[in-house]
Amino acid sequence: SDGGAGGGGSSNLLTGTCPSSPFISNDSNLGGNTLCAIVGPITSDLTLTTDVMYRLSGLVDVGVDMGGDGTKSGGVAATLTIPAGVTLAQKTPDDYIVVQRGSKIVANGTRSEPIRFTAASAIDGSLTNPDSAIGLWGGIVILGKAPINKCSNDVRGTAACERVVEGSTTAIMGGASPDDDSGVLNFVRVEYAGKEIFPGNELNGITFGGVGYGTKVD
């Protein structure tokens, strides 16, 4: 992913107020912009605003795993909606987001106003190697209930065919719904992401696991 523009000059600073939500807290000032921390798990629908910047505060789960058939006990479905032009600027490799099975991310950017997941250092001007920097924050993991092939033949294609996704030690993917809908990603830029969980298991910029064809990515 490319580095892109920084936080911008004073003419386009985002100095609004953090939304009132149990999943958002005041963080700090970032390059003159108001920074609001998103805290998980997000257990009801949340829509971000466009007059501030955000960061993922550690692991942010969207929803609680609904299972391969959407009926898992304790599961909670939630939708995170990110409007066009919003920037999420993470501070550490431990900042990442997991959209659990049965939940959605609706990130509808546009060509002129993309949604940007980046590093805080790219906003405040402290990033020294923008052309080669990686691993400054975790990434995006999207999990669905669509069939996967990494299980035994006797359960393949059923809701019991599930496994832990790469980039995690606990997040589960898979199910029996080919048309499963995990949301929308349109004009979303992911910069400076990636994290090694342990050797051979790492987060990438965007990880899809068991995502069905109802999910829209453009």
Language-model features: locations:
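Beta-strand/loop edge motif enriched in small/polar residues
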Residues: 1-218
